[in-house]
């Protein structure tokens, strides 16, 4: 969850104003080159912070302070960076480090700052008027499963006490051994007992373990891009890799450029099943197909009719890592109510160029997509074409709405934070 749940009572809004004293508002000045990124007409960007390290998700407090989850990488600082703009110029000039545990998902809820690490959910009590919490972290959930691959965890809250955490599957398509040419998938896939889904916990109860959670949705490979919006949980999933490498008799390198799609799902009820590892969504045929590990040849649907289809789909291998719905009014009307999605970018489209180093916008009408997506922010890779992912200058990782309706974007390469504003045409 990247913003506060809408629908607060007036009393709670007043309480938050005491916890987060507001700073002087100012129209920020954008960089001449938008900090190296490209935006639609009427938009511009400034670099609000830089050099933070491997920045993941971020969240803005009501007064404009921003909290950024920093991943644990060898030799890097880890924890949460708390950022404050003390003079209203749009750039953060005060920085404090909270904790020393790296994570991905981050949220502010009812006076607490939450962080999802690969194995836990932690929270700190916010101190009125202070940028940095004074006390130590409390453990909300511990013993979350992780086996290295797909360990990053996002957070979402339903506003009724429910805390939702993704548990990614440490696998490509449930083969044993994993990622081997011609090896069939395990059927049923045993990983789905403890991985490959969303688990629900009580946000108000400390000391929970994974065993205390309930599986809310399943059949999802990896999905740190989760958020609660308009009464439902929304997810953008990282789909399987290298379909041509492991099954060349059915799929070519050209097929791998477009298969499978990165799907967006809405969880309508507890127990929804989205079909991984048995099926994938085909971006060109617009339907679920059997994975080759389960007998698929790129045409057969088989058992896939029993699983929920996506509400939207994005090109193969773009790697969605964060999503937030826009509830502000600064941006033009067409953006209001839609979803901004941070894509980390592909690594396995060779021999074709890599792709998907962007922030994309998916328009919505109510709780349904209302048209084709548009690539909103580009230029993160720093070169076009990009052949090797390790040559990318930046990779979008987090998106969060500021109190004034501008949009923050984080970079996991060197820790740059962009603030995107609408100036008008």
Kindly give the residue locations of the regions a language model identified.
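Short loop/turn segments immediately following the C-termini of beta-strands
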Residues: 71-73, 118-120, 126, 168-170, ...
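Residue-level detector of Asp-centered blade-edge/turn motifs that repeat once per structural unit
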Residues: 60-64, 108-110, 157-160, 227-231, ...
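Asp-box/WD-like beta-propeller blade repeats and closely related beta-sheet repeat scaffolds
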Residues: 94-98, 103-104, 109, 119-158, ...
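Beta-propeller domain segments
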Residues: 26-39, 152, 169-211, 218-222, ...
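Beta-strand-rich domains and repeat architectures in extracellular enzymes and scaffolds
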Residues: 46-72, 319-325, 340-342
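Blade-level signature of beta-propeller repeat domains, shared across WD40, Kelch, NHL, RCC1
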Residues: 400-425
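Conserved beta-propeller blade signature
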Residues: 65-69, 112-115, 162-166, 232-236, ...
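Surface loop/turn motifs at the tips and blade-to-blade linkers of beta-strand repeat domains
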Residues: 48-52, 96-101, 140-147, 214-218, ...
């Amino acid at each position: 969850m990247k913003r506060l749940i809408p629908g607060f009572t007036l009393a709670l809004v007043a309480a938050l104003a005491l916890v987060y004293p507001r700073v002087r508002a100012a129209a920020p000045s954008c960089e001449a080159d938008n900090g190296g990124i490209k935006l639609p007409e009427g938009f511009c960007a400034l670099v609000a912070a830089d050099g933070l390290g491997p920045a993941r998700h971020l969240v803005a407090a009501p007064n404009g302070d921003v909290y950024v989850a920093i991943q644990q990488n060898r030799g890097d600082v880890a924890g949460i960076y708390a950022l404050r703009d003390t003079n209203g110029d749009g750039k953060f000039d005060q920085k404090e480090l909270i904790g020393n545990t790296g994570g991905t998902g981050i949220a502010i809820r009812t006076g607490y700052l939450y962080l999802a690490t690969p194995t836990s959910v932690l929270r700190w009590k916010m101190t009125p008027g202070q940028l940095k919490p004074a006390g130590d972290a409390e453990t909300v959930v511990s013993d979350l499963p992780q086996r290295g691959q797909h360990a990053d965890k996002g957070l979402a809250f339903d506003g009724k006490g429910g805390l939702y955490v993704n548990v990614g599957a440490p696998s490509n398509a449930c083969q044993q051994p994993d990622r081997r040419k011609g090896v069939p998938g395990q059927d049923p896939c045993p990983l789905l007992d403890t991985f490959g889904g969303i688990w629900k916990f009580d946000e108000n109860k400390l000391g929970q373990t994974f065993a205390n959670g309930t599986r809310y949705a399943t059949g999802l490979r990896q999905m740190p891009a989760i958020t609660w919006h308009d009464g439902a949980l929304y997810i953008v999933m990282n789909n399987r890799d290298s379909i041509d490498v492991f099954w060349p008799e059915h799929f070519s390198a050209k097929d791998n450029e477009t298969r499978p799609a990165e799907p967006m799902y809405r969880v309508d009820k507890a127990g929804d099943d989205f079909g991984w590892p048995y099926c994938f969504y085909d971006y060109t045929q617009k339907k679920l197909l059997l994975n080759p590990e389960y007998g698929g040849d790129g045409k057969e649907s088989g058992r896939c009719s029993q699983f929920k289809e996506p509400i939207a789909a994005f090109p193969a291998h773009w790697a969605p890592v964060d999503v937030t719905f826009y509830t502000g009014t600064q941006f033009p009307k067409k953006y209001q109510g839609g979803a901004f999605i941070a894509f980390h970018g592909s690594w396995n489209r060779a021999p074709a160029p890599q792709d998907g180093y962007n922030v994309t916008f998916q328009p919505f009408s109510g709780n349904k997509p209302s048209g084709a997506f548009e690539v909103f922010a580009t230029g993160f890779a720093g070169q076009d074409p990009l052949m090797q992912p390790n040559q990318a200058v930046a990779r979008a990782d987090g998106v969060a709405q500021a109190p004034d309706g501008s949009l923050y974007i984080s970079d996991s390469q060197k820790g740059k934070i962009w603030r995107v504003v609408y100036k008008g045409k």
